[in-house]
Amino acid sequence: MNTVRVTFLLVFVLAVSLGQADKDENRMEMQEKTEQGKSYLDFAENLLLQKLEELEAKLLEEDSEESRNSRQKRCIGEGVPCDENDPRCCSGLVCLKPALHGIWYKSYYCYKK
């Protein structure tokens, strides 16, 4: 009867120790898989970020081209007072001191070139 108990105890100890080894091995495999998954997610995230940056650059390029081709805005028309140091006269106009009329205002006006 003692041999049966000893045999049973020996088998039980071996099963428990081998089971724990399998558990540790499974845990290590799971860690490796999660690390691989994380690296894949990092790669996918970086790829998506690059695509978004390229798209943003294209959109900003289109905006700058559009602003270059758009009409002039916020300019001063003909016969309107302007600042001598910062003339904002429309294209084709120049900020000049008036010849006859308006000299008493001591101001500059936008005139045709």
Curated annotation (Swiss-Prot):
UniProt keyword list: Disulfide bond, Ion channel impairing toxin, Knottin, Secreted, Signal, Toxin
Asked whether the keyword rRNA processing is assigned, the reply is no
Q: Which residues form the propeptide?
A: 22-74
The molecular function terms of the Gene Ontology recorded here are: sodium channel inhibitor activity; toxin activity
Give the region (Disordered) as residue ranges: 61-83
> Where are its TM segments located?
none
One matching Pfam family, short form?
Answer: Toxin_22
| Family matches, as InterPro entries | Toxin_22
Localisation: Secreted
User: Is RNA-binding one of the keywords UniProt gives this record?
Assistant: no
Q: Name one GO cellular component term.
A: extracellular region
Q: Report the leader peptide range.
A: 1-21
Its tissue distribution reads:
Expressed by the venom gland.
- Regions annotated as coiled coil: none
Disulfide bridge partners, by residue number: 75-90, 82-95, 89-110
Q: State the function annotated in the UniProt record.
A: Probable ion channel inhibitor.
Recorded domain comment: The presence of a 'disulfide through disulfide knot' structurally defines this protein as a knottin.
- Family of the protein in this entry: Belongs to the neurotoxin 14 (magi-1) family. 01 (HNTX-16) subfamily.
Q: What protein am I looking at?
A: U11-theraphotoxin-Hhn1p
Q: Which organism is it from?
A: Cyriopagopus hainanus
Its ancestry begins with: Eukaryota, Metazoa, Ecdysozoa, Arthropoda, Chelicerata
